[in-house]
């Protein structure tokens, strides 16, 4: 991950977060993308989930070092593993695609470089989550 990617990601998430319905839109897209996903979220408080997601996005962005962030990712990965929530690895790719789709809708400066930055910034965290399944 390059410094420029982190900068683009950070600026983009700030633009998206200016609108309170950004993460709601993401969850609408994500839940509609798969029956499996919809079932996983059947009894979930989506407002609480959206707050946790925003925190997790920043943690994933900066998970390349600081031990407390890595500890958070470890906890998150354990929770999502086959022994707890059983989030299958292929669902993370769908998650990222729907997240970037929501970003495209909400970030007025979205372009191919922004798309690539979101993917490069989040990919290490996603790969970590998949590896702990």
Which ranges hold each PLM region?
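Globin-like tetrapyrrole-binding proteins
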Residues: 1-133
């Amino acid at each position: 991950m390059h410094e420029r990617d982190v900068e683009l990601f950070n600026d983009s998430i700030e633009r998206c977060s200016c609108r309170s319905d950004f993460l709601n839109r993401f969850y609408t897209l994500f839940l509609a993308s798969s029956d499996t996903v919809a079932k996983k979220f059947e009894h979930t408080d989506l407002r609480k989930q959206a707050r946790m997601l925003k925190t997790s996005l920043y943690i994933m962005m900066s998970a390349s070092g600081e031990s407390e962030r890595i500890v958070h990712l470890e906890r998150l990965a354990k929770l999502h593993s086959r022994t707890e929530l059983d989030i299958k690895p292929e669902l993370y790719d769908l998650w990222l695609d729907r997240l970037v789709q929501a970003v495209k809708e909400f970030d007025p400066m979205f372009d191919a470089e922004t798309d690539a930055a979101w993917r490069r910034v989040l990919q290490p965290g996603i790969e970590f989550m998949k590896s702990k399944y």
